[in-house]
Amino acid sequence: LGPTMGYTCGYYERDDMDLDESQIAKFDLALGKLGLEPGMTLLDVGCGWGGALELAVQKYDVNVIGITLSKAQSEFARERLAKLDTNRSIEVRLQGWEEFDEPVDRIVSIGAFEAFKVERYPLFFDKAYKLLPDGGRMLLHTILAHTQKFFRDNGIKVTISDLKFMQFIEAEIFPGGRLPAVEDIEQLAADSGFVLERVHLLREHYARTLDMWAANLLATRDEAIAITSPEIYERYMKYLTGCADFFRRGITNIGQFTLVKP
């Protein structure tokens, strides 16, 4: 993954960017849409290993609260952020968004929404709306599915092989997972009272990110097999290369949604 420990879609501002540069650019792209000002408080829902929190403190001089359900991630992020030279408040909590009830100025969520149960989508949007002040902003970064109508309208053919790969992802990589469509986010935003200011799709950027992850895994094949197994190695290569193909062909997409509380 590199020093950032970013494990979501990178953002390639230049053709010569490496994987880690693309992760920093992705965090900056998301944070830059929030209108952050020094002294604000930013909530990161599903903060991962702390990459976005670190950049938010360093570049935007804000107080940060990260929440995650992973004990390992929370411990790593705390240790990472403790090294920053700042007077701003930094918290990383082992907590779900359902339990968070403090007012914040801005919210960012990168690569967490995909893991939420569909029936909880409206609750999340309502919670975010409630936490923010008037004029507050949320940046939601999520992988997206498409409707059958979208495939027909855009001439995208989905083969039997593609359907089998979808079954593989659902069974072995993200059990029980279901991706939202752009239309779902639009409806959720409207229903909760948000204004959807911008939809920024990054499909090609994720294909490139997945290609780079696969290349890194291939380059360390023997080491990866030694600490896991040949079966796990092959499963992850199938996942990375298959998903890269899906993003290239437009079967799946990924987007950043800028939401404003009026």
Predicted regions and their residues:
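Substrate-binding/catalytic lobe of Class I Rossmann-like enzymes that use SAM or dcSAM, i.e.
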Residues: 144-256, 260-262
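Conserved Class I S-adenosyl-L-methionine-dependent methyltransferase catalytic core
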Residues: 1-33
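Conserved SAM-binding loop of SAM-dependent methyltransferases across substrates and taxa
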Residues: 49-60
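Conserved class I S-adenosyl-L-methionine
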Residues: 39-46
